């Protein structure tokens, strides 16, 4: 597969990430995981704001001896697979696939999930239904088409983002994460599927599974993933449901001019960046050079500097041609002064601590 490059970064790109080992001490119970938010495909045309899509990416093997996982950037999903866009509505596609137990599952999902989505009869008018169905279908196809047992013993988390018009659809199965910058404020676009999530625990237990020492059935750190067909009691080919689910949670929003960029990262990134810290870090770098690929490289390098030893991947999508602006604070009777989002966040933390 190949796509056109956009500013040296918008292309079909392959890389790898891997699951970061997590100790039980890292698990804190969350109260809730968000449910799906729906939006009609046609709403993308309801405003004069037109996103200018740019993207960049970077992967690093980190402290590992091998790269298990993958990512993908496709500027025109339908055209990439020989299909025509509906009403000339271009759909771009981005994904990070964080593999474990080998690279086979991550590479299979990277290579096949976009195609399965495009070839669905309801694409693109019912994208939410299509994406949810395609995750599960790709998972089943991986089990059916693997010709050797080693491939079946691998698994992968998967997070994808699709942009069409002014709509952004994020689908997540696992613990990769997507964070949106809305005028310098971090907006969580996905929930980590780990055993610390209360809704995930309830789902697991309702399907006969259990959590042991922070692991699903004592075997897996994530509660949703594709692959892992070798693990007993978690799912069966052709059977609906199961403690380990390949069905993604979806979140869709309408983009506005306040929305600056989206960061997609493997879990190793988020173990060393909070959502807001990642947004602050990214805004500052983009204001310096406005180079998305370089910014992804800097995010990965900063995670390594902070102690990350896993494979790492960062993908960024910007919705504007220009860099994010400095935020301004009105001071009555005084001249406006610029202050960065990072500075505002630090000030807020300081004031809340008093």
Swiss-Prot record:
Binding, Mn(2+) 1: 98-99
Recorded catalytic activity of this chain's protein: O-phospho-L-seryl-[protein] + H2O = L-seryl-[protein] + phosphate; O-phospho-L-threonyl-[protein] + H2O = L-threonyl-[protein] + phosphate
Binding-site positions, Mn(2+) 2: 98, 267, 310
Broad EC category: hydrolase
PPM-type phosphatase domain span: 54-319
Molecular function GO labels: metal ion binding; protein serine/threonine phosphatase activity
Entries under Gene3D superfamilies matching the protein: PPM-type phosphatase domain
Pfam families membership: PP2C
Enzyme Commission identifier(s): 3.1.3.16
GO biological process: signal transduction
Top-level lineage group: Eukaryota
UniProt key word DNA repair: no
Keyword hit for Magnesium: yes
Keyword annotations from UniProtKB, A to Z: Hydrolase, Magnesium, Manganese, Metal-binding, Protein phosphatase
Family classification: Belongs to the PP2C family.
Name under which the protein is recorded: Probable protein phosphatase 2C 27
Organism: Oryza sativa subsp. japonica (Rice)
């Amino acid at each position: 597969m190949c796509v056109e490059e956009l500013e040296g970064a918008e292309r079909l790109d392959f890389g790898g990430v891997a699951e970061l080992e997590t100790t039980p001490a890292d698990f804190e119970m969350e109260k809730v995981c968000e449910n799906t938010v729906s939006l009609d495909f046609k709403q993308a045309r309801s405003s004069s704001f037109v996103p200018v899509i740019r993207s960049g990416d970077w992967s690093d093997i980190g402290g590992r001896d091998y790269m298990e996982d993958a990512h993908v950037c496709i500027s025109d999903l339908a055209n990439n697979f020989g299909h025509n866009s509906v009403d000339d509505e271009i759909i771009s596609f981005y994904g990070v696939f964080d593999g474990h137990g080998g690279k086979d599952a991550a590479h299979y999902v990277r290579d096949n999930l976009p195609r399965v989505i495009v070839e669905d009869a309801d694409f693109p008018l019912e994208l939410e239904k299509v994406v949810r169905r395609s995750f599960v279908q790709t998972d089943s196809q991986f089990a059916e088409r693997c010709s050797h047992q080693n491939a079946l013993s691998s698994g992968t988390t998967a997070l994808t983002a699709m942009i069409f018009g002014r709509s952004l659809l994020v689908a997540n199965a696992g613990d990769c994460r997507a964070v949106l910058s809305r005028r310098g404020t971090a907006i969580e676009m996905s929930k980590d599927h780990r055993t610390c999530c209360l809704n995930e625990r309830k789902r697991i237990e309702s399907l006969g599974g259990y959590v042991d020492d922070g692991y699903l059935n004592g075997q897996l750190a994530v509660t949703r993933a594709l692959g892992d067909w070798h693990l007993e009691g978690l799912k069966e080919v052709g059977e609906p449901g199961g403690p380990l689910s390949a069905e993604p949670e979806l979140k869709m929003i309408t983009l506005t001019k306040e929305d600056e960029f989206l960061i997609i990262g493997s879990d190793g990134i988020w173990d060393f960046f909070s959502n807001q810290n990642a947004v602050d870090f990214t805004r500052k770098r983009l204001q310096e050079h406005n180079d998305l690929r370089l910014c992804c490289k800097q995010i990965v390098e900063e995670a390594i500097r902070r102690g990350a030893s896993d494979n790492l991947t960062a993908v960024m999508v910007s919705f504007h041609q220009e860099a994010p602006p400095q935020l301004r604070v009105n001071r009555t009777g005084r001249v406006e002064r610029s202050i960065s989002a990072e500075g505002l966040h630090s000030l807020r933390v300081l004031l809340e601590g008093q």
